[in-house]
Amino acid sequence: MKQVNGEKLLASLGDGVKDIRGRITPDAPMDRVTWFRAGGLAELMFQPHDVDDLIAFLKILPEEVPLTVIGVGSNILVRDGGIPGVVLRLSAKGFGFVELAGENRILAGAICPDKHVAAMAMDNGIGGFHFYYGIPGAIGGAARMNAGANGVETRERLVEVNAVDRKGNKHVLSNAEMGYSYRHSAASADLIFTSVLFEGYPEDRAQIRAEMDAVRNHRETVQPVREKTGGSTFKNPPGHSAWKLIDEAGCRGLVIGGAQMSSLHCNFMINMGQATGYDLEYLGEQVRREVFEKDGIKLEWEIKRLGVFMPGREVRPFQGVTSE
């Protein structure tokens, strides 16, 4: 796919951008905003000031221009050819809030870190959110993918999601309308989540603190929390743990280029220093191949791969045919 110059794309939006209050950056380096610290350029990055600013921008953005929404960059792998069109990165100022919204209820902006919701709940004696303390990333992504840990999932706490569609129309989706399943929601990919309403239950703050401490201590013991990583690489197949399948296939510590499957937790892929998007994705596909050849199970990516490949540096997805 041919990538248009960012300045040219910006100019094509016309005078309407003069009323936009957020930050617009042509040719924005994605390796500065993703936790993997790898990948090419975003043709145009937009960080809206608030919901109204987001709507104003969407109304001037032509439908044919691709739009990619990212959160804090914790669960994405950007390919080296970059991301054509507009990358929407919600700003912490307009979308990073967290506040009480009634008895045992919390309202959080889509870019609010998961752990901030856990902390707000603990401070106010609201139970049921300790699991967020161990999940990297932001609330919008957690709501989108039904993030979970320690036996609890987002769908168990979520009341509704506020969103905006590609045309700038507002929507409110109930828990039922989200259509949740394991690490998945049925919400339209066209919807941009702006905030999420949660509900917990009364619980002693000391008990919540103990639960959060247990989550933190476990995570720091078994996960490479200080490495350049995007979190869990693959979903757990039904009845199996992805890390165990990876380990049994001999892929713990496997290295390709500057990328490695962590020796500490082998379902975490890490950038050892200078890994490219190609290195990381090739490593992931090689792991999928090795696991399939060992156990006949096709691992499904949990990390989202975004953008286009550099010419001559394409990664073929493993299709589950060992003769490939």
Swiss-Prot record:
Predominant place of localization: cytoplasm
UniProt KW Cell wall biogenesis/degradation keyword: yes
FAD-binding PCMH-type domain boundaries: 36-203
One Pfam family in the UniProt entry: FAD_binding_4
Compartments where located: Cytoplasm
Cross-referenced Gene3D superfamilies: 3.30.465.10, UDP-N-acetylenolpyruvoylglucosamine reductase, C-terminal domain, Uridine Diphospho-n-acetylenolpyruvylglucosamine Reductase, domain 2
Catalyzed reactions per annotation: UDP-N-acetyl-alpha-D-muramate + NADP(+) = UDP-N-acetyl-3-O-(1-carboxyvinyl)-alpha-D-glucosamine + NADPH + H(+)
Transmembrane segments: none
Domain of life: Bacteria
One of the record's GO cellular component terms: cytosol
Keyword presence, Oxidoreductase: yes
Molecular function as annotated in GO: FAD binding; UDP-N-acetylmuramate dehydrogenase activity
Active site feature: R183, S232 (proton donor), E302
Enzyme Commission code(s) on record: 1.3.1.98
Pathway(s) annotated for this protein in UniProt: Cell wall biogenesis; peptidoglycan biosynthesis
Alphabetical UniProt keywords: Cell cycle, Cell division, Cell shape, Cell wall biogenesis/degradation, Cytoplasm, FAD, Flavoprotein, NADP, Oxidoreductase, Peptidoglycan synthesis
InterPro entries xref list: FAD-bd_PCMH (IPR016166), FAD-bd_PCMH-like_sf (IPR036318), FAD-bd_PCMH_sub1 (IPR016167), FAD-bd_PCMH_sub2 (IPR016169), MurB (IPR003170), MurB_C (IPR011601), MurB_C_sf (IPR036635), Oxid_FAD_bind_N (IPR006094)
Required cofactor(s): FAD
GO biological processes: cell division; cell wall organization; peptidoglycan biosynthetic process; regulation of cell shape
Cross-referenced PANTHER family: UDP-N-ACETYLENOLPYRUVOYLGLUCOSAMINE REDUCTASE
Protein role: Cell wall formation.
Family: Belongs to the MurB family.
Protein name listed in UniProt: UDP-N-acetylenolpyruvoylglucosamine reductase
Natural source organism: Rhizobium etli (strain CIAT 652)
